[in-house]
Amino acid sequence: AIAAVATLGSLLFGYDTGVISGALPYMYMPFDAKGLQLTSFEEGAIGGTLLVGAALGALLGGLMSDRWGRRHNITFLAFLFFAGAIGTTIAPNVWVMYPFRVVLGFAVGAASATVPVYLAETAPKRIRGSIVAIDQLMIVTGQLLAFSMNAIINSLQGGPKITIAEDPSGHFTPNTYAFDEIAKLQSSKGGPMSAEQYHAFLDQLSISAGNGEAWRYMLVLCSIPAVALWIGIRLMPESSRWYLAKERLYDAIGALKRVRVPEKDGSIEDEIMEMVEARQHEKDEESQRKGFSHVMATPWLRKLLLVGIFLAVVNQTTGVNTVMYYAPKVLEYAGMSTSASITAQVANGVMSVIGSAIGIWLILKFRRRQVLIGDVIGVGITLLGIAATFQFFIAPHMANHTTPPTWAAYLILGLMSVFMLIVQSSNGTIVWTMMGEIFPANVRGIMNGTAIFCMWTANAIITWTFPPMMETLGGGITYTIYGVLNLVVAVVLFKIMPETKDKSLEEIEVEM
């Protein structure tokens, strides 16, 4: 029951980061068609502001959890998930939406720092490993759920539509059109208009109707699991280990009794004694705990921190979130219709879930170093395949204002699906595992927090800059940059990445 309830936080993590991919095509519609008439910069900002909030949440979530308790913190985060979902849903424009995206992002980041700890501290030993692995699986399941709901809502809407009452420029007669027909006028999609000309064209249209509000239906669904999490977590006990950290022994015993079956999990008294001894050991460590200045003044720790930050950033330079957030828009650039691209995103979600399940097996069977380096090389090759498809089979048609062949868009989709399978099967799993292994206990908090903050910051930068890059540089150059970057990263990893599997901290220290 605890796993089912607590992992709703991870489901929300996945849902809130994934839902935007289907909402953006409707947000691009004109104001009079009930969209937000986004520019590429605003599109990037909608994704980026969530990740700025997530960086802050990851930085502060652990502190909040230590002060208030895991359960109370998750309860508060459920409220933030709900408030962020409702706020973004009713936002009349992007400037009102941005702060609510930051709130939503804060909940996402803080949940990433709190939920795994709560699960690890409350789960019985016999299922602890599988429950924490399920937590990671729930994130990608949440993204798949978001993609699926987006596809259903889009299908019910019949795709983005707009009714033009009058077009002074003479491009369109009064009628109802698929918004794709209007969007094709952009130079980035093979049309004759620059971004500025296109937005000026939209402003002069007289629009009588449109279904651009569909993005609101997609976003409001985020509130349902938030309510379920808020109700469910209030029925769960606090972490017994947190109670012990606060010297509340009797509360710790009571909490443990609620989540243990003595016939399966052994003596509660014995486990409490183990926890008391572990807590005493932690106190001894805390007396020796050092700060950030100690890390920077110690050469091997400083090098280890840089390796940890590099690993965290590598988790994002794969470009995984350019697919999670923007795949439908990328597929539109490749010539696929909006409706088809929103539905096609479900395939990426399925491959992501399969990849995450494979990752649980890979990390047990192979060495961390060889898996991650192989993953990054595979990612680089796949991204260069996407770049080549754009450059040689799509860009020439855009330049000539002709329609790219249908198979080219589906080739892009196929390469994206392979990309998601590769990146989710090893990159995230390896990076998160290694960051838990390479940092010494007396500085683990500050070093891990710094690395995670850098990861979310890199995520925000990539998410914010990707839409303008696609619009100005095109898919060929944009994906070439990411592909080459990953091959360079693979070389750097080969030179600096330590192997941590089956090694003690002392052995890692000698390597560094």
Q: Where are the model-predicted features located?
A:
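Boundary/linker segments of alpha-helical solenoid repeat arrays
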Residues: 264-270
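Transmembrane-helix signature of 12-pass secondary carriers
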Residues: 1-257, 270, 276-512
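Short helix/loop segments within enzyme catalytic domains
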Residues: 260
